[in-house]
Amino acid sequence: MNRFNGLCKVCSERRYRQITIRRGKDGFGFTICCDSPVRVQAVDSGGPAERAGLQQLDTVLQLNERPVEHWKCVELAHEIRSCPSEIILLVWRVVPQIKPGPDGGVLRRASCKSTHDLLSPPNKREKNCTHGAPVRPEQRHSCHLVCDSSDGLLLGGWERYTEVGKRSGQHTLPALSRTTTPTDPNYIILAPLNPGSQLLRPVYQEDTIPEEPGTTTKGKSYTGLGKKSRLMKTVQTMKGHSNYQDCSALRPHIPHSSYGTYVTLAPKVLVFPVFVQPLDLCNPARTLLLSEELLLYEGRNKTSQVTLFAYSDLLLFTKEEEPGRCDVLRNPLYLQSVKLQEGSSEDLKFCVLYLAEKAECLFTLEAHSQEQKKRVCWCLSENIAKQQQLAAPPTERKMFETEADEKEMPLVEGKGPGAEEPAPSKNPSPGQELPPGQDLPPSKDPSPSQELPAGQDLPPSKDPSPSQELPAGQDLPPSKDPSPSQELPVGQDLPPRKDSSGQEAAPGPESPSSEDIATCPKPPQSPETSTSKDSPPGQGSSPTTELPSCQGLPAGQESTSQDPLLSQEPPVIPESSASVQKRLPSQESPSSLGSLPEKDLAEQTISSGEPPVATGAVLPASRPNFVIPEVRLDNAYSQLDGAHGGSSGEDEDAEEGEEGGEGEEDEEDDTSDDNYGDRSEAKRSSLIETGQGAEGGFSLRVQNSLRRRTHSEGSLLQESRGPCFASDTTLHCSDGEGATSTWAIPSPRTLKKELGRNGGSMHHLSLFFTGHRKMSGTDLTECDEASRKRKSKNIAKDMKNKLAIFRRRNESPGAQPASKTDKTTKSFKPTSEEALKWSESLEKLLLHKYGLEVFQAFLRTEFSEENLEFWLACEDFKKVKSQSKMAAKAKKIFAEFIAIQACKEVNLDSYTREHTKENLQSITRGCFDLAQKRIFGLMEKDSYPRFLRSDLYLDLINQKKMSPPL
């Protein structure tokens, strides 16, 4: 092998290995982990990779002579899968250095200590690894290889073994950290280094747990009989860092709160499957507080025994298959994003709620005793509150929310710049009511007695610093030197503002609406600001996330707020010749400008007690534009009455009068688009979210959770995944590429008025949808007359179909279905008693014809209708009798629902997918049985309970008995 990157031939052969691996029947026989660079996680015994010489912990630098050192693990995995026959890897091998141990054993320590060394130039690496000063503890992330004369070489995936207890002479090492199952390489194990390194605290102190009112039961000492109760803490073996490295002594990590006394406990081994991301369980900020054996409800009557590990910031659900060995069941639940429902004091059940795919899911757990439930709930509620106080409330902006929906703090007359802010209290009240749209108060420890009253304002600052924060939705004070480049996009909230003492002010109460003032939105937070919650936004974040000051808002101007749940009417913002505004899809187009109707202005004046702000307010002109699919108006519709800054109230009334005559047809089928933006449906409005576009602009894009399907990454088997697959970590990178357009789509209301202007001929309407053809004036007139005479009926029908995209769809959960299929099922509408039977089981729901239709309509709102479609396709497949038709239908079902990157791919694990693929070699009626059972179980555990709680189902079981038809 020649030289690589300046190393001599000897060093190159020691450190770099070029390995050719041929594909076997089960893939290449190894798994990978980590990002930038990617490392070999495990090598199958006897597989192609092991025969070729690949070893665990090898760092992949090149794949087929392409540099991949900075690739992500998912990207490299897809690239390896796409290689048909063989791959050529250039790897950097960790070469052990032999060093005598304390008792004559051999301690092998990796010469390349960290990812920091791997990213440095090879010549620097060689120097640093052999002769340089020892690397700082915070740079040591690599795995150490420890060899003892009796125990042999130990090598684990994410384990950090080291030399422990040199002074005391301890050299006890755990068994080889590989799963005991001989054929399953998809597990890695995190084992404690020393059997005495975990402690059990079995009981809470009786005088520390608050007793519930009305209960006479005292907290009894429950000493863990039958392994039901385990309150644990981990002794952290660390010295300046969170790994098992270079620790000469053991020191315990004292918890923040005491749940009981210390009792020794045999160590437990946590087994992480490959689909679960391993955790740094030795992080000094992460303390194991509690371990309890509970019952987890997997169905209505099906339970399983699980072991819950409660850390200071997350929960781990595990199952103890063997004594002392816990398999992790799923990804961890972080306490800052979960909620606890304790239920009644007599019931032993309690629930843990979390968000998945923007929908609320829950785990139902059952304790073995009241004491155990009280202990677990006390620990969880205490730490959930602690973590959520540190976390900023997430910002969720909807598709049709407008600038007027921002929370604004009203200013009070007589308040000057010298007004003082109330100091927030440090003791939160448990029963405090939070403002709408927020899960936590923005202040650190607010109390209800010190919230800002209605009408009290924060003093305007002449020159606010970029790191200052304002309460959610409040206008920023005017700045002395505003610049157009400081403008931020509409539709994002402001983070809470901190005063000079470092505490945040509480948000203002809800107040009446003022839709003529645009508020200053909040810039998107960078990962640095989202992870470091305690530091102000100005620190540790990129310059683009700093909060600039807003311009164009006088300090003494009255501003009010509107509750976004009550009304989302898009504001009509006047426009001057010197300023061009960016609009949301529900706002007015550049060709139709006007102020609010007089009725809305009158209501606003009455409710707020102040006259509305003048419509001549000028807003800045340099906001980035949304990128929206273009539906342009033809030039024939741009014949306005001259360019003017804003239309008068009389013009608005005249246009309203025109609409009154034209709106009769729209009222026939309850699909009027006048109030298109007034609806607050979370499912509809959350389909689109804003994201960074090219050249600093902002674009509308489909939410990541809707575009992505979950894939099992169990092994590197050959699957034809498309090169454009976007993983969880790389999905956002594909949105900001390409050129952007600066044209903004008009609102449906504006479009309706625009199409009705200037006569509103059918030809004008058809040109809008069929495109503009440039012709001379004479030819255009002749074609107009001819087309009107020949195709008026066809065009009218076509127009009605195409204009339907701008009408409000009647998709609310409690509304009556409107499609043809739903109309045919109206005659089968069940009674309340029949609908109540659907709650007994999912089978009874699917056997009922109307129930099947209703459940399918509900799944469409949940964006998971492919699960039911797959189940129904499998049922139809079992009814096919012809073998040839059965083979064709089986391939169609596999390609449509099971194949990776299929158009309606269902969520199956890799084993089920491979098993179904093998069944297609010899097609029978039961070749989809396993996949069908998995999807049925998924619907039964996930979608079916949500359906029973939905408004659609509740309306059916609570429907009033109608009088019989005549």
UniProtKB/Swiss-Prot annotation:
Phosphorylated by cyclic GMP-dependent protein kinase. ISGylated. The modification Phosphoserine is found at residues 712, 715, 747, 776. The keyword DNA damage does not apply. This is Regulator of G-protein signaling 3. It comes from the Eukaryota. The keyword Protein biosynthesis does not apply. Pfam families: PDZ, RGS. Its main location: cytoplasm. One of its GO terms (cellular component) is plasma membrane. Down-regulates signaling from heterotrimeric G-proteins by increasing the GTPase activity of the alpha subunits, thereby driving them into their inactive GDP-bound form. Down-regulates G-protein-mediated release of inositol phosphates and activation of MAP kinases. One of its GO terms (biological process) is negative regulation of signal transduction. Residues 841-966 form the RGS domain. Residues 527-548, 576-594 have a biased composition (Polar residues). The gene is Rgs3. InterPro entries: PDZ (IPR001478), PDZ_sf (IPR036034), PH-like_dom_sf (IPR011993), RGS (IPR016137), RGS_RGS3 (IPR034951), RGS_sf (IPR036305), RGS_subdom1/3 (IPR024066), RGS_subdomain_2 (IPR044926). Residues 649-675 have a biased composition (Acidic residues). Keywords: Cell membrane, Cytoplasm, Membrane, Methylation, Nucleus, Phosphoprotein, Signal transduction inhibitor, Ubl conjugation. Detected in embryos from E8.5-16.5 in cortical ventricular zone, dorsal root ganglia and cerebellar primordia. Isoform 3 is detected in testis and in spermatocytes from newborn mice. Levels increase and reach a maximum after 21 days; after this they decrease again. Long isoforms are widely expressed. Residues 676-686, 820-830 have a biased composition (Basic and acidic residues).
